[in-house]
Amino acid sequence: MKVRSRPRIVVIYNRDFEGAEADPENKAREDVKDVAQDVLRILGASGFETGELGVTNDIPEALSALVAMKPNAVFNLCESIHGDNRFESLMPLLMDLSNIAYTGSCPFGLSLALRKEKVKDILLGSGVPVARGGLVTCVGDCARLEIAFPAIVKPAREDASVGICSASVIHNQTALEQRVAYVLETYRQPALVEEFIEGREIYASILESVDGEPTVFPFFEIDFSDMPSDRPNIVSFEGKWVEDSIEYKGTRPVRCEGLSTELRACIAKTALNAFRAVGLRDYGRIDFRLSPAGVPYAIDVNPNCDLSDLAGGYSRAAKAAGLSYKELILRIVTLALTRHERASTIALHPAAAAVSADVPGAVILQREVEASAPRGGAGSA
């Protein structure tokens, strides 16, 4: 059997930001292509063979093309199909069936994370605090909710802050019913209604090692000090994606300071519990609202958080932990390669050696890759 001298990594990403299915909230999908190009550049410069596949709505064609490329692993950036992120798990499922290794969470974790009401139940059962609330499928359901105002209303099956704006935070029953009606009609899915937790918004980013041990990066939080007083302190869609908006300027990510050692440990432990409970893999981020009483309430579980270099909160946290963007991408690729049954036939060392030895964390990455290689050498069958 001929052993490939260099692993081939194919980067896949969704192309549903193009054409008729594009929508006004398209920015959240369109940025994925820029991330794909950054990843391809890093992998190519690090000694990997690379391939690129933009996934369209023709899934059989996409799978056939991917199989023909014979990747040793896939860097998965395919976050939606047909403009619908409910199909985020489809390509990972097909790759599992085709015995193709890929980065990130498995179909179960990806699908579950989009069922926000189910995630709340699982988190609650795992001892992770969540805001009181419920799923609403019609306006009439609002009357049965046992919540206190203010509350927040958001689409139950979206991510990337899609469907969240200043009007999402409501203060009375009439506003609740109006906002629920808007979500049901606009997004054609149930609405999730939760008590709004006043307090700091803190992000805990997590990265696994090749032995499966997760590490929590330094926390970041949102600085709302420049948010106008007539707007709620939330990260809306505009706050996340529209750079010239008031919300964007009022939601500045900063290092999380001023937490006691005990509270930091509590948030880290809670984040790891949430990561495991929802079935995330390789990397992810848990978002919290810290109540005035010091309770970290999990408000979102992100299996496919933004991996962009400059604007991405996840890469920002990795850099705070001493990992360069290049190291982060190589670490994630290594996780996929070492997980696959064919990893013993792949020469992993050149890619690891491409990481500069004077960059913090490079030695750790090298050791992880070496530990994953078979005793007889990286090229043994």
Regions found by a protein language model. Give the residues of each.
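ATP-binding N-terminal substructure of ATP-dependent carboxylate-amine bond-forming enzymes
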Residues: M1-A101, P107-F108, L112-L114, K118, ...
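Active-site nucleotide/adenylate-binding loops and adjacent lid/helix of ATP-dependent enzymes
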Residues: K2-Y13, L66-K70, S111-L192, I197-R200, ...
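Flexible, glycine-rich phosphate/dinucleotide-binding loops
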Residues: E18-G19, I59, C142, D159, ...
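Short acidic, glycine/proline-rich loop/turn micro-motifs
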Residues: A20-E25, V162-C165, A311-Y314
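Hydrophobic beta-strand scaffold residues
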Residues: T50, A101-Y102, V130, A151, ...
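ATP-dependent carboxylate activation and anion-phosphoryl transfer catalytic cores
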Residues: I122-L124, E257-A381
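Phosphate-binding site of ATP-dependent enzymes
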Residues: Q173-K269, P292-Y297
